[in-house]
Swiss-Prot record:
A monovalent cation. Ammonium or potassium. Keywords: ATP-binding, Coenzyme A biosynthesis, Cytoplasm, Kinase, Metal-binding, Nucleotide-binding, Potassium, Transferase. InterPro entries: ATPase_NBD, Type_III_PanK. It comes from the Bacteria. This is Type III pantothenate kinase. Its EC number is 2.7.1.33. Substrate binds at Y86, G93, Y94, D95, R96, T171. The lineage of its organism: Bacteria, Pseudomonadati, Bacteroidota, Bacteroidia, Bacteroidales. The gene is coaX.
Amino acid sequence: MNLIIDIGNTVAKVALFDRTSMVEVVYDSNQSLDSLEAVCNKYDVRKAIVATVIDLNECVLAQLNKLPVPVLWLDSHTSLPVINLYETPETLGYDRMAAVVAAHDQFPGKDILVIDAGTCITYEFVDSLGQYHGGNISPGLWMRLKALHQFTGRLPLVHAEGRMPDMGKDTETAIRAGVKKGIEYEITGYITAMKHKYPELLVFLTGGDDFSFDTKLKSVIFADRFLVLKGLNRILNYNNGRI
């Protein structure tokens, strides 16, 4: 079994893969990894990969360093099954690259736009030759809602869930509709522009936030909430024998 440890800005995910098939995923605190020991005792883990976008505290580091299997710590020097053309690979978030790797692994030989709607919304492009050209970073749903509250004097902090008319009927619905529809239009705009350049473009959407798209747009999107975990597993398998 492969142990995949994905430590994000808000939560950690601990997943188990049997070769290329995901067996289980556990959501955990990124400050403690309480589930790690139980997961390791439950399965016959042979190797692991650790990927983090935050600085790990001593408790988490101690747990990871006690893992009784070879561990691949994902960084800018890790060998990848795609060609990385990013000019500053040391600043590239592991989650961005892992999502690209997973999408390319599923559809090699295709031009692919990968959209990850999480804390931030990222847009990544990998071409049919497996060359990762880079991507863009935009504020995510919660970040936009929070910014409207923090950087103004009177706008309230609005929850993402709730009534959302086409045009807001009060301040709460105006903020919710403005932010969520703004994100939907942004994503639609990226897809439209990229498909103009690459008519056979495939689109992957992952991340924790769900958005509504019209029927025509839905037909070109592959939604996969576990794309990053699958990419990390692919990277671990690709580096088999190097750890």
